[in-house]
A protein has these predicted regions:
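Active-site donor-binding segments of glycosyltransferases and PAPS-dependent sulfotransferases
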Residues: 41-107
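A charged, aromatic-enriched C-terminal amphipathic alpha-helix characteristic of glycosyltransferases
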Residues: 78-81, 341, 345-371
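Membrane-proximal helix-turn-helix segments that form the acceptor-binding/catalytic region
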Residues: 135-167, 176
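Conserved donor-binding/catalytic core segment of Leloir-type glycosyltransferases
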Residues: 199-217, 223-229, 234-237
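Nucleotide-activated donor-binding/catalytic signature segment of Leloir-type glycosyltransferases, i.e.
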Residues: 245-270
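Aromatic "clamp/platform" in nucleotide-sugar-dependent glycosyltransferases that forms part
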Residues: 284
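Short hydrophobic beta-strand element within catalytic cores of glycosyltransferases
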Residues: 301-305, 314
Length: 372
């Protein structure tokens, strides 16, 4: 049993260690909101120019970078693993350390008396449920090394995850996955949405995709569907560091009804959200994603695939349109054709009612309780 000193959360010196600020993603934005709620510091492998500028977003705490920016995925994992193991001695200075994403090897550098919290977005998918997908992309001569390293990293992860005082999962889906792979128990704490940033303004003539251009998000299939619907317009918002960017650009070449836009979070983004017909998201077994909740906050329904955490957040036929788990591009087309501007408008009241359950104020209250 470990007994923590009875400090108020404001008195506890707290830091969040997040693996990388590489993208303008929902994981990165969650850490920013969490840090503001706790008035704490942030450490990361690196802070990329392609991610949020935390100072511009109002973050005033200390920022600690333990490595340097690197894009090549396999090398990045190895370099960051070394940095988290050997360059995080500063964690000893904190009363509470919150770990986010793939950085928990640094737990060995925390003070024995500190409170260690793991906010689990998912067990590393390249080590577990999507391991075979990653393996397919690796040249044959590298596969033996990948198998050896991934085996070692899995053993490390399963040993390290047992050292936490508190484990939080971002959804029931993540709770199940973490328990399945590690047998560890956790408590569910849904990420928040800043509801005041989203509102219904108007409805224009386009559907919206707001996802990283990567294999796991399956944006290529959304593009394929809209290539067959030249009368329907698609706007894709992406990040400059997205790994599948060039491939998807080439796929959409000469399609006048598909537009790609990259923009900082606080510039133009909400304008595109407010004026869309609906959002389209078909990721692979997603753990938690703010996309559908933010969409509902803007009174916009979602087209989603019948897998992952989404069943926890939206109501079929009232706040979303569902495509089958074993879907084809034709199912995306059918969903878009069904979700006309008129049908989307009829869903807007239920959308905003459901989004209220994911408010920032509720998240702020709960995360402060866990830090005590």
């Amino acid at each position: 049993m470990k007994i923590f000193n009875s400090l108020d959360w404001k008195q506890r010196k707290t830091i969040i260690l997040h693996d990388t600020f590489l993208y303008k993603g929902w994981g990165e934005r969650l850490i920013l909101m969490m840090a503001k709620a706790l008035d704490c510091d942030i450490a990361s492998g690196f802070f990329s120019r392609g991610s949020f500028n935390l100072r511009d977003e109002g973050f005033q705490g200390k920022m600690i970078e333990v490595s340097s920016e690197v894009f090549k995925k396999g090398y990045r994992h190895l370099k960051l693993k070394q940095a988290f193991l050997f360059k995080t001695k500063f964690l000893q200075d904190y009363d509470t350390v919150i770990f986010s994403w793939d950085c928990i090897s640094a737990i060995r550098n925390c003070s024995p008396d500190s409170k260690k919290i793991y906010y689990c977005h998912t067990p590393p998918r390249y080590l577990y449920d999507l391991r075979d997908e990653y393996l397919k992309k690796i040249p044959s001569y590298i596969k033996p090394a990948f198998n050896l390293v991934s085996w070692a990293f899995r053993k490390m992860y399963e040993k390290e995850v047992k050292k936490f005082d508190v484990i939080l999962s971002n959804s029931i889906n993540t709770w199940k996955r973490l328990h399945h792979f590690t047998w560890e128990e956790s408590q569910v704490l849904y990420p928040p949405v800043e509801l005041d940033k989203f509102q219904w303004i108007d409805q224009w003539d386009y559907y919206l995709s707001v996802s990283r251009l990567s294999t796991a998000k399956r944006i290529d299939n959304i593009v394929k569907a809209f290539k067959q619907m030249p009368d329907k317009k698609l706007v894709v918002i992406y990040g400059i560091n997205d790994p599948q960017k060039e491939e998807i650009f080439e796929l959409a070449k000469d399609c006048k009804n598909i537009e790609f836009i990259t923009c900082p979070w606080n510039e133009w983004f909400t304008d595109y959200v407010w004026k869309s017909i609906a959002w389209i998201c078909i990721p692979i077994d997603e753990d938690f994603w703010m996309v559908p909740v933010e969409s509902m906050s803007a009174w916009k329904p979602v087209i989603w695939v019948d897998e992952g955490w989404i069943k926890e957040s939206v109501i079929n036929g009232e706040t979303w349109v569902l495509i089958p788990e074993w879907w084809a591009v034709e199912d995306i087309i059918k969903a878009v054709e069904y979700l006309t501007p008129q049908v989307a408008l009829s869903m807007k009241t239920r959308c905003i009612e459901r989004a209220q359950d994911f408010s920032y104020s509720e998240f702020e209250k709960k995360i402060r309780e866990f830090v005590k």
